[in-house]
A protein has these predicted regions:
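Structured beta-strand-rich core segments of catalytic domains in phosphoester-bond hydrolases
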Residues: 35-36, 42-121
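N-terminal, active-site-proximal structural segment of metallo-dependent hydrolase catalytic domains
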Residues: 1-49, 62-65
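Surface-exposed cleft-lining segments at the edges of enzyme active sites
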Residues: 81-84, 116-134, 170-174
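Active-site beta-strand/loop signature of hydrolases that rely on acidic residues for catalysis
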Residues: 6-7, 22-40, 111, 140-163, ...
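Metal-dependent phosphoesterases centered on the DNase I-like endonuclease/exonuclease/phosphatase
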Residues: 46-50, 133-226
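Short amphipathic alpha-helices and their capping/turn segments at secondary-structure boundaries
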Residues: 20-22, 92-105, 136-149
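Active-site-proximal beta-strand elements of phosphoester/diester hydrolases
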Residues: 1-10, 108-123, 154
Length: 228
């Protein structure tokens, strides 16, 4: 199966690009972050017309996650909306079991999508919420892995795993997205048996997923790799 993750930054704006890319890249299942749409107006019909089942958990203006799977290649079951056992008004997590229709004898994959909190600033209440959120996610993944060893977690992690994922490491040292507690929390997720799939292969230097548009970051390639 070809699995992918995309911070769409408003599905209302990005829907044509998402549908085009799902087809051109032959994606079997996709987790989306920052859909920024409430469930009552989610474009479910557009995904169905394109041949996808879609599941979603949204809110107005902020956050929101979704998971879609291709009907001809994937059987989707046991959809979970939100982090189990942790009521949170912010809609940030979704997961489901995926079974490839071409190989029904294979065990299913637990496909998870997360929109990690940004944290705003080191030491702030939003930063503490971020660390708490990741701790709950860690417990959730432990439970999942006990039942389903084949697990994929994708999303906007809002953490640069290492200095190699930052265009100017010294400028970001100790700051939000790069602070030591954030990276340690991410390392604990890897310690569960997960791998950063991007780093399993030789990559060119300075490959990032986020740039600050206010400082012409994209044009200058001054960015961070915070989407895993």
């Amino acid at each position: 199966l070809r699995l992918a993750s995309w911070n769409v930054n408003s599905l209302k704006v990005r829907l044509p690009q998402v549908l085009d890319w799902l087809e051109s890249a032959k994606i079997d299942a996709l987790v989306m972050q920052e859909t920024k749409t409430t469930d009552d107006v989610f474009p479910q019909a557009a995904f169905a017309e394109a041949g996808f089942d879609v599941f979603f958990l949204g809110q107005k203006t902020y956050n929101g996650v979704a998971l879609c799977s291709r009907q001809t290649t994937v059987k989707t079951s046991d959809v979970v909306l939100g982090l189990p056992g942790w009521p949170d008004p912010q809609k940030r997590f979704i997961s489901a079991l995926l079974s490839p229709l071409a190989a029904p004898e294979q065990p299913p994959i637990r496909f998870c999508g997360g929109y990690f909190p940004n944290g705003q600033a080191v030491g702030s209440s939003k930063y503490l919420y971020k660390l708490d959120w990741i701790a709950v996610l860690e417990r959730t993944l432990k439970t999942y892995l006990a039942d389903t060893p084949r697990l994929v977690l994708g999303g906007d992690f809002n953490i640069a795993p290492a200095d190699a994922d930052v265009s100017n490491p010294e400028a970001w040292r100790g700051k939000i997205l790069c602070s030591e507690p954030e990276r340690k929390a991410l390392e604990r997720l890897f310690a569960l048996g997960l791998y950063d799939s991007f780093r399993l292969f030789t990559q060119p230097a300075e490959r990032f997923s986020w740039w600050d548009y206010r400082q012409s970051g994209f044009e200058r390639n001054h960015g961070l790799r915070i989407d895993l």
